[in-house]
Amino acid sequence: PICTDRVVASDIEHPNDHTAPSEPTITFVEDTNPKDGKLNKAENSSDGDNANTTAKISIPTDAVVGDVIKYTVNGGAEESHTITNADKTAGHVEIKVPVTDGQTSSVTAKIVDQAGNASKEVSGSIDVDTTAPKVDVETVTPVDTNNPADGNPDKGIVKGHSDEPNAPVVVTDKDGKIIGTGTTDDKGNFEITTDPIKPGDKVNVEVTDKAGNKGNGEGTAGDIEHPNDHTAPSEPTIT
């Protein structure tokens, strides 16, 4: 009888390759408006998935098809992704990262080549803030500054409060035109001087937090005030 032995080749060994690949970079693709390391509600909603955001792990130029990206998400178990031709062409891979309002989401990543050499591990994180500020408009006052008063408002004063201190405030009229700007104080209070407004005019007050979330409140102008008119009218005559 003739006996035939079959030998199956094992994986290629690389005994002389001791060079680690370059490290990747990590970016969060929804962090765009503004790009500040914070994820606001509008950014997180841009792809319709409010439970996750997308992280992009770059593929360095010296990484090749068959090398492995090892990564973790939010401190979880290490996962592996073998680089494909499509990945190499794109120059990156994308992974889903769960997000929770008020918490920080994080990713670590490194490249391991086919000789087992590992790049430096890099990390990236994003602070998640998807809660808009609360805005309470307390008074909207037309002001006639003339002495004597002529009944025509020269400006408006809008007062209120937000739960966001030291934040920009924008006041607009019913048509969306900006009529005043300012900032909340360290307790969240604001007093904004505006263009002239009349009794009954409606205004919108928008407060933007540090993550870019926008909160809104509305108010209606009351009666005209005349703070500078201290002149008594002439007395009448009686006949």
Per-region residue spans from a language model:
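Short proline/glycine-enriched turn/loop motifs at strand-loop junctions of beta-rich domains
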Residues: 60-66, 161-167, 198-200
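Structural beta-strand segments of beta-rich domains
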Residues: 51-55, 154-158
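Glycine-centered loop-to-beta-strand initiation motif
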Residues: 88-93, 184-192
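Short, acidic Ser/Thr/Gly-rich low-complexity loop/linker segments typical of extracellular
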Residues: 82-84, 179-187
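Flexible, low-complexity linkers/stalks enriched in Thr/Pro that connect modular domains
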Residues: 5-31, 113, 123-138, 144, ...
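Hydrophobic beta-strand segments within extracellular beta-sandwich modules
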Residues: 107, 203-205
